[in-house]
Amino acid sequence: TATNTSVVVNKFGPNDLGYIPATPAELGGWTGGNATMVNNAINSGSFLLQHRDHGYEQGWGEPGYSSSNIDGLTNTDLTYVFSINCLTGKYNMAGECFAEKFHRYTYNGNNSGALGILAASEVSYSFVNDTFVWGMYDNMWPEFLPTYNSTPVERGILPAFANSAGKYFLQASSWPYN
């Protein structure tokens, strides 16, 4: 467990917002997914894909999903990807990083993969990433953190604006330091 696990469970768990269980065991037989499940979700038309765990230049650690798995996509409804972890957007590396592959991918000559992707270009820090994501979600769904009182204008409730909102939330928040 991370140092701030109790803070997160107290806020988002059954004693406050109720978004998560008190312990992972309460999730039942959930295994965390795999590359096939990720591709099936995207190919079925998922609007938004969120990954918040370990990442590297060519993909995600848990569940394992890499640039080569993107070749299994056949979607024509493009998804938006929040890849909030280390290095998946490392555009300055030799060759194509994970975010570039996701964004440029085509299937049978048609755009496939992602319409847009938000990904870190360098190493990022876990609890800071969590706090950033909470700010993004509260911008897109203002009731996510009811006590934060965000009031974005309707045109601002989009993934691109959520990126900025997450940064403002992180700057104003004491979360990473609790």
Task: List where the protein language model places each region.
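Cysteine-dependent hydrolase recognition
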Residues: 1-178
